[in-house]
């Protein structure tokens, strides 16, 4: 089993695997191009996102620059999606964001997990847990969503929150 297959299966994997590092570098190049595009070039930005992300619900998607992600293909967004400036997604595991979601500035979604034991952490092994955001969710500015969290439908997350557990 490759390290990428382990990562996608939620197993412990080497974060410094050559295949994974190469894929990360390729995505960084795409993200760099996206972040340099004119903010008024909605069609061009949408086309790039269609190729980068795993799924886009419709053409009513706006992700303001700058935007950052690790792999892109693990991210699925529903219809009528909006993310403000500095949206960061560490998508080592699937990140599913359903319909009619609004994300404030400086929001981060993390799926990668690291050991709290420094000796183990220094081996550069990690694992990942998926994040799911339901329909009609508003996530306020500067929110951090940690690995393994599910946020239910019709939820508002207040600005500055750190979401560590599921919210029904």
Residue map of PLM features:
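Terminal amphipathic alpha-helical/low-complexity segments used for targeting or macromolecular assembly
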Residues: 1-59
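Short secondary-structure boundary/capping segments
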Residues: 4-5, 53, 123, 130, ...
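Short cysteine-rich loop/turn motifs with clustered Cys
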Residues: 59-61, 98
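Flexible, glycine/small-residue-enriched loop-and-beta-strand segment within the central core
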Residues: 67-77, 82-150
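Short-chain dehydrogenase/reductase
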Residues: 138, 156, 162
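Short, intrinsically disordered, charge-balanced linker/junction segments flanking boundaries
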Residues: 164-168
